[in-house]
Amino acid sequence: MNALRKLLATGRTIVAPGATDALSAKLIEAHGFDCVYIGSYATAASRFAIPDTGLLSLDELVEQARTIVEAVKLPVIADAEGGFHDAPEIWRTVQAFERAGVAAIHLEDHTGAG
């Protein structure tokens, strides 16, 4: 059973502070949290100093996630926007985050770029 499933099985509230980069993820880990969250807004702001308006590509989100996953031993949950369009792209999105080592993603129910 992976680390996130074990955490969820405890039934307790899990606090997953948002990381903007590997350093902030390391600080989250050092302060004893159980999990790390990566939001698309944090990625857009920290990497490009832009608001989250759906302009980030799947590759940009996954690369940020991979960098954070490699920096910590905690499970990482990532914002995968809207899955990047249709069913085949959503499948590709899931696979890309899985290969990056992300424990879970969430998909938003919006239309638009991401």
What are these regions (language model features)?
Residues 2-3, 10, 49-78, 100:
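Alpha-helix-loop-beta-strand connector modules within alpha/beta enzyme cores
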Residues 36-60, 82-87, 105-114:
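Glycine-rich, proline-tolerant flexible connector loops at the mouths of alpha/beta enzymes
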Residues 25-42, 101:
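Catalytic domains of carbohydrate-active enzymes, especially glycoside hydrolases
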